[in-house]
């Protein structure tokens, strides 16, 4: 057993030291994936069935006519956030060219020459721009995931332009501007859905910080043996996800894995762990995952995570007092966001919820 663990660490280290990620393996024309990427046999099905989108489909909410249909839209958000934890939004106000340009920028960076990308490769999370493969490469007990990523905190203190690669610099600033606007609206609508004043969640700094996490999922020669992203829930208040048309995102709903089918121009919204906690389970943060890419072209996704600040601080959060009563007492102890975030990343994406540690 000790030898196997040592071998796994050595192989992960050797993979990491190439600084070229999963894209480097594809460029080397491999036909079999390295064993560090292999899931335990049978774990992909996890004894939980897949269901087609004809059986289940996550809610789609149209923001067109929001000024005249606000109450109706708030009701739909309340239902989606409490029963699904996810919904897709269309006519959200972010121009299609902005969505396309950020996807193109992510692709351009990940398809740069290796010597260019290597200059940004780091495992130091304090850097303004962090490029690597699997943030939890050394901490997760699960297999290595079939994807490469880069991350950058865009608010409250935006990076200097020269901190970002030329390939995606302009697109990241423009996209982030639109994400902050949409995030502002979503937190207003969620506050109203909870029966609170519209600025309640914003006043708690729930959207003060914005982290862009941009994934590149190369085609996989053995997609049934590995996974793109392990099942997990998000350590944020709210996440806005832009996915391309390849698909592969699934959420866990009523003991089944349900496909989140791509809709051109739509954005996927999901509730994070922090929002579930402060609402005392009135909204839910659900597990989701990404299957390994079966397509002939790479899958691109851009996740915008909203939290309190650029770096998690020791702000303490607990369930909102207005949402508690004698019949609905607090279900969670207060959390220190910095402590929570450090524990979440130390645990890695291992398929277990970290929020459960804070249940009373």
Swiss-Prot record:
Gene Ontology terms, MF aspect: dioxygenase activity; metal ion binding
This enzyme's EC code(s): 1.14.-.-
PANTHER family: 1-AMINOCYCLOPROPANE-1-CARBOXYLATE OXIDASE HOMOLOG 6, OXIDOREDUCTASE, 2OG-FE II OXYGENASE FAMILY PROTEIN
Keyword set, alphabetical order: Iron, Metal-binding, Oxidoreductase
Domain Fe2OG dioxygenase: 208-309
Family listed: Belongs to the iron/ascorbate-dependent oxidoreductase family.
Tissue specificity as recorded in UniProt: Constitutively expressed in leaves and blades.
Entry-linked Pfam families: 2OG-FeII_Oxy, DIOX_N
Requisite cofactors: Fe(2+)
GO cellular component, as recorded: extracellular region
Main EC class the enzyme belongs to: oxidoreductase
Amino-acid positions noted as binding 2-oxoglutarate in the UniProt annotation, renumbered to this chain: 299
UniProt cross-references to InterPro entries, sorted A to Z: DIOX_N (IPR026992), IPNS-like_FE2OG_OXY (IPR044861), IPNS-like_sf (IPR027443), Oxoglu/Fe-dep_dioxygenase_dom (IPR005123)
Biological processes annotated in GO: biosynthetic process
Cofactor binding note from Swiss-Prot or TrEMBL: Binds 1 Fe(2+) ion per subunit.
Protein name per the record: 1-aminocyclopropane-1-carboxylate oxidase homolog 6
């Amino acid at each position: 057993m000790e030898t196997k663990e040592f071998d796994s660490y050595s192989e992960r280290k050797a993979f990491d030291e190439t600084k070229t990620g999963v894209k480097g393996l594809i460029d080397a024309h491999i036909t079999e994936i390295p064993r560090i990427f292999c899931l335990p046999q049978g774990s992909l099905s996890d004894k939980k069935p897949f269901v087609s989108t004809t059986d289940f489909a996550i809610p789609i909410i149209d923001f067109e006519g929001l000024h005249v249909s606000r109450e109706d839209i708030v009701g739909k958000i309340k239902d989606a956030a409490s029963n699904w934890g996810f919904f897709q939004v269309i006519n959200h106000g972010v121009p299609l060219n902005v969505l396309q340009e950020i996807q193109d920028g992510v692709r351009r960076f990940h398809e740069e020459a290796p010597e260019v990308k290597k200059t940004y490769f780091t495992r130091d999370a304090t850097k303004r721009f962090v490029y690597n493969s699997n943030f939890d490469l050394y901490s997760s007990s699960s297999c290595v995931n079939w994807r490469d990523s880069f991350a950058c905190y865009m608010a409250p203190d935006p990076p200097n332009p020269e901190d970002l690669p030329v390939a995606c610099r302009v697109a990241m600033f423009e996209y982030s501007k639109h994400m902050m606007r949409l995030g502002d609206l979503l937190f207003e609508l969620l506050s109203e859905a909870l029966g609170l004043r519209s600025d309640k969640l914003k006043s708690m700094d729930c959207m003060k910080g914005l982290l862009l996490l941009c994934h590149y999922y190369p085609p996989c020669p053995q997609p049934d043996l590995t996974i793109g992203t392990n099942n997990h829930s998000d350590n944020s208040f709210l996440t806005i996800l832009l996915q391309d048309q390849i698909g592969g995102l699934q959420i866990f709903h009523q003991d089944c894995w349900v496909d989140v089918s791509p809709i051109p121009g739509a954005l996927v919204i999901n509730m994070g762990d922090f929002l579930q906690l402060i609402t005392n389970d009135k909204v839910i943060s659900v597990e989701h995952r990404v299957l390994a890419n079966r397509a002939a072209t790479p899958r691109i996704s851009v996740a915008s995570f909203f939290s309190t600040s650029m770096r998690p601080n020791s702000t303490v959060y607990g369930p909102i007092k207005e949402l508690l009563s004698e019949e609905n007492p607090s279900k969670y102890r207060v959390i220190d966001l910095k402590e929570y975030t450090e524990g979440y990343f130390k645990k890695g994406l291992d398929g277990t919820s970290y929020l459960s540690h804070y249940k009373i």
